[in-house]
């Protein structure tokens, strides 16, 4: 058993660490509130983009836009979002396990895989995989929002260009879904082709609404030009919404991780204090025994 001085040193060390984790918990909580506001602000835009693309594609199905229609799958692409920093529990590793399972299934089916990674954690993880080709990387920095959005937009455009050129036949988005402050879960959603995003029932219902005159669109320019631009905006909206939601997940996961670390530090301190009291009691008992032995000898 350690002596009393060593135990006191350990207690002080754990207390110092506890102060750091407690401060990080408060910082993460503050950042999480801001991230949730941004996430909620962008959701109406993403939902509107969903509705518009669903309605327009149902009414404009005659135009052979490469983003709309299914084709034989020989190669797929993934846009994987992660964090640039750690200390956020199992947020990143759970996401990587989820998407890696899908990637392995594709490789077993002899389907090639291209990956666009957002965040240094995903970049470091997928760089170690031999059968995965990283074609673009980007990072989201909350301090440089405009620069980050431009960088991410450029990385996403690489994947869109590859899809248009027929170099990939499916495009997926892998990110974390914000369920609550204490729960985040990995999510894999189809971005392209757009036809695969909606169920057969949704497509049929939208076609019926369009033919019955429930709604219609008047195009000021050529429908092909409008549809091309709309498809790109739709993908950008999905990616931006996923990135902001992933940022909220990161701060929530970090807050909970730091809270758990702070609570665990309290448990360790309690155990160390108990050990210290046992050592101190043993020392006192030994001293009393020595005094009694000396008195008896006299």
From Swiss-Prot:
The keyword Calcium does not apply. Produces ATP from ADP in the presence of a proton gradient across the membrane. The gamma chain is believed to be important in regulating ATPase activity and the flow of protons through the CF(0) complex. It comes from the Bacteria. It is found in: Cell inner membrane. The lineage of its organism: Bacteria, Pseudomonadati, Pseudomonadota, Gammaproteobacteria, Thiotrichales. NCBIfam families: ATPsyn_F1gamma, PRK13422.1. GO terms for molecular function: ATP binding; proton-transporting ATP synthase activity, rotational mechanism. Its main location: membrane. Disulfide bonds: none annotated. This is ATP synthase gamma chain. It comes from Francisella tularensis subsp. novicida (strain U112). The keyword Oxidoreductase does not apply. One of its GO terms (cellular component) is plasma membrane.
